């Protein structure tokens, strides 16, 4: 195991966010007596993904994103409440969602047992993200959790990665790994700073500067520790 410090993104990485989002979308439409399938949740996720690109570029604010994703979804699947009213409800539900990614706890346990220091590094709201990780039973493996609102910068900025690296206590960038699902904000941002990048999942098709690519936690474990 060559890495001594590993940073993990939270949504779509340590947490199985798609499962949570599909469930919440079903609960939302149940409020108007409508049963929807996973396809509606998947449409929401695609809309959300597209809007996050604009947010990462600084073209919209986080608050605008929260409302716009439902404005667009309701244009396809009408809902009896306005997007402005649904947005805070959805955030509250998501803050309670804590579906762990399959194999995440096992990998964290193995990394921790190997003496690796483990951190989370997200572009989300710290209090919300940390609470979800704790409810998922993963916080006991973590050294510290970093979030954009507490740092005052977002991935992929140099300021963000400079902060988490310096506050991690690590001194060797070549022994520092960033694992995330976003090829631009997670992987390319980390690699441009000097870390090693690992792209997790299959949500994005864009090219990245990742040294490692894994679709599952088991694949990532095999990459880091070698196949048993």
Predicted regions and their residues:
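A short, Lys/Arg-enriched amphipathic alpha-helix followed by its capping loop at the start of a domain
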Residues: 28, 107-114
């Amino acid at each position: 195991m060559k890495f001594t410090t590993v940073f993990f993104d939270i949504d779509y990485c340590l947490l199985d966010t798609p499962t949570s989002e599909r469930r919440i979308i079903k609960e939302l439409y149940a409020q108007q007596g409508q049963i929807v399938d996973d396809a509606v949740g998947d449409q929401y996720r695609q809309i959300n993904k597209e809007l996050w690109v604009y947010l990462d570029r600084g073209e919209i604010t986080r608050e605008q994103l929260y409302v716009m994703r439902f404005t667009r979804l309701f244009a396809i699947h009408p809902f009896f409440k306005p997007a402005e009213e649904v947005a805070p409800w959805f955030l509250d539900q998501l803050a309670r969602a804590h579906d762990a990614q399959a194999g995440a706890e096992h990998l964290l346990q193995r990394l921790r047992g190997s003496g690796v220091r483990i951190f989370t590094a997200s572009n989300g709201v710290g209090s919300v993200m940390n609470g979800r990780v704790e409810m998922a039973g993963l916080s006991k493996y973590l050294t510290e959790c970093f979030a954009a609102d507490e740092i005052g910068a977002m991935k992929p900025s140099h300021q963000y990665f400079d902060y988490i690296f310096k506050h991690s206590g690590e001194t060797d960038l070549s022994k520092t790994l960033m694992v995330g699902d976003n090829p631009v904000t997670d992987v390319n941002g980390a690699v441009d700073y000097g870390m090693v990048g690992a792209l997790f999942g299959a949500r994005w098709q864009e090219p990245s500067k990742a040294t490692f690519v894994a679709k599952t936690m088991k694949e990532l474990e095999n990459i880091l520790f070698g196949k048993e």
